[in-house]
A protein has these predicted regions:
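Short acidic-glycine-tyrosine-enriched beta hairpin
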Residues: 65-80
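Short, conserved beta-strand element in jelly-roll/cupin
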Residues: 35, 46-61
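A cytosolic small-molecule/anion-sensing beta-strand core signal
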Residues: 55, 71-72, 90
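Short strand-coil-strand connectors
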Residues: 26, 62-66, 89
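Ligand-binding loop in jelly-roll beta-barrel domains
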Residues: 80-104
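A short, N-terminal "cap"/entry segment at the start of jelly-roll beta-barrel domains
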Residues: 1-27, 31, 107-115
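Conserved short histidine dyad/triad with adjacent acidic residue
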Residues: 31-45
Length: 115
């Protein structure tokens, strides 16, 4: 077992409105992201299943055929391969869990987040 403390994990400043801390295990990634109001995570998809739990604020997830708002205390399940865009309607903190782990984040091949 290994104990992780969020405040001891290096924070990545991906762009002026998005910051991330991440833990990568052999089989999953868990990340805590801070999004400033107005932040847009551009439309993208990945093979990973994703569960996003909003801890603070409100996010709008836009996907083919619709959109859904997720607020504090709510979780959204995003199946593998589903394209989605995220818009921060308020300053927000979200906990994202991915399986399998985000190899693109491990390797730094996540340019869509760094715009």
């Amino acid at each position: 077992m290994k104990l992780h403390r969020w405040n001891e994990i290096a924070e990545e400043h991906l762009n002026p409105s998005l910051e991330r801390r991440a833990i990568h295990t052999d089989r999953l990634t868990i990340a805590r992201l801070n999004l400033k109001q107005g932040c847009v995570v551009p439309n993208h998809w990945h093979e990973n299943e994703q569960v996003s739990t909003v801890e603070q604020g409100r996010l709008k997830f836009v996907y083919p055929g619709g959109a859904i708002e997720v607020g504090a205390g709510e979780s959204l399940e995003i199946p593998s391969g589903v394209a989605h865009e995220v818009i921060a309607l308020e300053d927000s903190v979200v906990l994202d869990i991915f399986a399998p782990r985000r190899e693109d984040w491990v390797s730094g091949d996540d340019a869509y987040l760094r715009r």
